[in-house]
């Protein structure tokens, strides 16, 4: 049986994942409207991935006979200065989500909730992967440059990542 604290934290995480999906959808839209189709595709796909993270949490809660408590999702940021800023914000956002997951893991350990601890190991690994991915993209954008030809090359680099993650 899940403790009240774990239930509260997992419900909050569902909403954080839904917010993440909306944020990446907003970033994707900005990219597409600025002819950055590669980054737009990557972020669009990533929005769907975040939605799947929320679904996985919902299923876990439901399997434990816990009703999910969805809250309102605030409007995501939609004005950005450029591709570097988008990926910097995305990287920082992933770090925030990692902290949140780690906090739930800490609570599961303290309450000796082995099932939740085991379930969350997938999220721990996933967050590590996402932080590495976004940091790598950010580093490449900064290396290539965010101006003219560099911006095009950076967009094509991100497009390549999006396509490789689908296969």
UniProtKB/Swiss-Prot annotation:
Record keywords, A-Z: Cytoplasm, Iron, Iron storage, Metal-binding, Oxidoreductase
Matches recorded under CDD domains: Nonheme_Ferritin
Keyword Oxidoreductase on entry: yes
Gene Ontology biological-process entries: intracellular iron ion homeostasis; iron ion transport
Reactions it catalyzes: 4 Fe(2+) + O2 + 6 H2O = 4 iron(III) oxide-hydroxide + 12 H(+)
GO molecular function: ferric iron binding; ferrous iron binding; ferroxidase activity; identical protein binding
Chain residues that bind Fe cation 1: 17, 50, 53
Designated name of the protein: Bacterial non-heme ferritin
Organism name: Helicobacter pylori (strain J99 / ATCC 700824) (Campylobacter pylori J99)
